[in-house]
């Protein structure tokens, strides 16, 4: 068997580490060509020692020099690259068959798009790629024969329970709606009057999942679910009015598909990202993920409730941006990234995140942008507007 050759973008984050855990269980199936780890040099050096990639990519020359010194000390022959173009290069290299796109934020868009242009199998964990450039990205993938496999647990769950020949045809397959589940985050039952006193340390403590700081805050505001709605719209060619969100605090049911005949098919499992990663990497096989069996005896109850937009205004804003279309999702994402960064840095209150996003969505912006240059320019304009607004909140 010829192993699949992988580039893993965001290898030092939680998705990247989970991916490498799955890869390590199947050395005969996978070979790592490149790892990208931004600024976590020590962790990336350890990964290079274990997986021996041809290339490792970091953010800049300073971190590249540090990584080179560590690799030289340990006798690891991996070549070190740095910068945005290096991410594009390792994502589109001829040797590579599959790319794990797990860089957080819109900064992951150019490398994901480069992989699509080269017809790679794309394991998509970077939801911002589709939020910012859904039409452009999916059309690029289709035109170049790139397979886009969803790694996000919710979209992966939907992918697993849809007919294999689904290909975006809802009506033909009798699909009434797609239902994304959400845990509700750490503040599902907290007093709304305390929200303006929520600290970054509290917001990053997710009750069920192990995630990075940014996505943990997005889960706490439910912006994460809003971004996932937009992602599902593009991934599954699903109209906004056929997308539902239900809060399911136990995070056992990862998503559902409602069919016209009254059936609802769901995918269940322990909340561990290695399950969707292994499903994508192993297709069409089911391979060992390292995740334990779901213990039904230990489940006391599975509960569900509708999301409350007063508690989660970011989810409402995401619905509005999805329905508006055009550049609105790009604006939504850029404003949210700027606001979450400011919150984590202690510059604004938790409740100011939604205020910042609402402010930016109220500004004038182009209805539609058809190329990556225009999208990145809109992203930059919105971030500047968000930073200016944040300055008035301090």
UniProtKB/Swiss-Prot annotation:
CC cofactor: Mg(2+); Mn(2+)
Gene Ontology BP, a term: isopentenyl diphosphate biosynthetic process, methylerythritol 4-phosphate pathway involved in terpenoid biosynthetic process
Residue sites binding 1-deoxy-D-xylulose 5-phosphate per the record: 127, 153-154, 183, 206, 219, 224-225, 228
Binding site for NADPH: 12-15, 39-40, 126, 128, 212
Keyword flag Glycoprotein: no
Enzyme Commission designation: 1.1.1.267
Pathway(s) served: Isoprenoid biosynthesis; isopentenyl diphosphate biosynthesis via DXP pathway; isopentenyl diphosphate from 1-deoxy-D-xylulose 5-phosphate: step 1/6
GO molecular function, one term: 1-deoxy-D-xylulose-5-phosphate reductoisomerase activity
Binding site residues for Mn(2+): 152, 154, 228
Catalytic activity: 2-C-methyl-D-erythritol 4-phosphate + NADP(+) = 1-deoxy-D-xylulose 5-phosphate + NADPH + H(+)
Name of a matching Pfam family: DXPR_C
Alphabetized UniProt keyword annotations: Isoprene biosynthesis, Manganese, Metal-binding, NADP, Oxidoreductase
InterPro entries per the UniProt record, alphabetical: DXP_reductoisomerase, DXP_reductoisomerase_C, DXP_reductoisomerase_N, DXPR_C, DXPR_C_sf, NAD(P)-bd_dom_sf
Functional note: Catalyzes the NADPH-dependent rearrangement and reduction of 1-deoxy-D-xylulose-5-phosphate (DXP) to 2-C-methyl-D-erythritol 4-phosphate (MEP).
UniProt-listed NCBIfam families: Dxr, PRK05447.1-1, PRK12464.1
Assigned protein family: Belongs to the DXR family.
Name of the protein this chain belongs to: 1-deoxy-D-xylulose 5-phosphate reductoisomerase
Lineage: Bacteria, Pseudomonadati, Pseudomonadota, Betaproteobacteria, Neisseriales
